[in-house]
Amino acid sequence: MALPKTLHPALTPDELAFLAEHDHISIVPLFSMTRVRLISGIYGPFRPPSASRVPLWLGLSLKKKRKCRIVPPEWLSAERLQAFLRDEKENSEGFERLPRRFMEISKVLLDIASDDLSQPTLLRSLLKDIREVRQAKIRMGLQSEDVLQNDYLQVTNLTPLELCELKPFLVRAMGLMQTLRPPEEEEDEE
């Protein structure tokens, strides 16, 4: 492979954002057009003010050309993000389930279509708070007895972005823990 070894274990955040752009969103077109056939599918018809479902990449492209207004996902509202944050803080044992590609889609929409979102500054702040709470849980999980004694870390409900950030560290740490394990324990397992 042409990539350096440091990039083999995980995808980059940009690659994850690229993958997220294949998820579908709703747009309100500002133009009229019949169906359009693309490699990824057939989209349309586009008639304002009716909403249409398109891949995120197409919605972003139309938004940059001022041809549509992006309808934010239902979870990208101040009320829902506050609920996610509250639930995340209350659940000290694990991670709350977040929508698929939560961080990647949020970032792209806030960067490109912030004028289509209500209270984008508040949304950024809430997303940052959610991310910080989850990162604190990851740090606490890495220091827990389960990791030190049983060689595992529960990562249920982590987002792909969080897993990619954590994976290189975990691979090195687990390898180091295996070398520190006493020899008699290794023989018992075989």
From Swiss-Prot:
Record's subcellular location: Nucleus
GO biological process: chromosome segregation; double-strand break repair via break-induced replication; nuclear DNA replication
Principal localisation: nucleus
GO annotations of cellular component type: chromatin; CMG complex; GINS complex; nuclear replication fork
Entry keywords, A to Z: Chromosome partition, DNA replication, Nucleus
Record carries keyword Acyltransferase: no
Domain of life: Eukaryota
InterPro entries noted in UniProt: GINS_A, GINS_bundle-like_dom_sf, GINS_Psf2, PSF2_N
Function: The GINS complex plays an essential role in the initiation of DNA replication. Has a role in chromosome segregation.
Complex formation: Component of the GINS complex which is a heterotetramer of SLD5, PSF1, PSF2 and PSF3.
Entry similarity comment: Belongs to the GINS2/PSF2 family.
The name this protein goes by in its record: DNA replication complex GINS protein PSF2
Organism: Cryptococcus neoformans var. neoformans serotype D (strain JEC21 / ATCC MYA-565) (Filobasidiella neoformans)
Gene name, Swiss-Prot/TrEMBL: PSF2
